[in-house]
Amino acid sequence: MKRQLLFLFAIFIAFNVTAQSDKMVKSVTLKTGVAFNYDKDAQDSVRVIFTPSGDSLGIKIYTKREGSVDFLYSQIHHVVFWSNQPSIIPDGTNVNKNNEIDLQKNPEAWRLEFPKLYQGSDITFEVTHSTPNYGITYSIEWDGKRRANRWSCYQMYAGNMLKNVKRQDAFIEDPKIPSVYNVSPNEYSGSGYSRGHLCPSGDRLCSKEQNSQTFYMSNMQPQIQKHNGGVWGRLENKVRGTWAPQGKDSKDTLYVVKAATIDPGNIKGYTKTELIVPKYFYMALLYYSKSSNSYSAIGIWSPHEENSTTEYITIDELERRTGIDFFCNLPDNIENEVEGKIDNENWGI
């Protein structure tokens, strides 16, 4: 307890929690040993994020070019500032976060958009795709046994929502997944189903490389076209045009998980090439507002039928239906608060 109080005291000295700090981050080193270095002049501001009860949640770095970057204290070993301020060593616990074993599968799995990684014995591939100029495009969990996407997750903020290029349309196998577990574009031929994006092409138009990565087959699900271009397409537009941070000066972030059901009992059947046809498509969304320093979350459930009725549900209910633990890297008290309710005013429903 004494250590925690000293830690919080150090945080309050280093930062004014009611305003942006003039302290800039020099480096962040994670417990995995991975280090992130930042130029002082490339940063717009830095904020330490606290829970309403005063517990430390993490650090948010706003860069001038790439938008915001989040680091959770539960994953940080230490932080060094561009000043004489001493390093910060975080304290605190999070029972269900992606732990050191999970991070061996994917070292990016500490990020807020990640669900809890698969804990069973089946072969899975946890893959992140990124570009040098725009950072992470999206991450996936791929079920090798089922040859199916379990989920795709990504962030949406001003710096990675630029519209610089057009849709590339080149469907190819994921280069990070062994061919024996992969799906090729021609496996959809004659199936009667579209290659339905999870991380949409329209969400990643910063560069040709970034957009091309959304056409990896690991980011697809067999989808009825009238669902893909109808109900689901309208939901994608709402995420992009309403719920994601709007405006180039926004400092907010939307954390997105998109997926479809692939487990027995929740599928419609199989294509002639044994691809699973999901019974439901769904989303888990977590919004961070910088101005209010708060989070809100919502689950979206879309039966895989033409003109199906969309359900807006809590994340707790979505977890019950899917068996997946979403936003597990949030501290437990924040996670429990936002996942058990829907703020109708924030989401406009």
What are these regions (language model features)?
Residues 35-59:
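Short, flexible N-terminal segments of the mature chain
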Residues 45, 55-349:
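Domain-level detector for secreted/extracellular nuclease and nuclease-toxin modules, and
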Residues 1, 14, 38-43, 256, ...:
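Generic low-polarity alpha-helical segments
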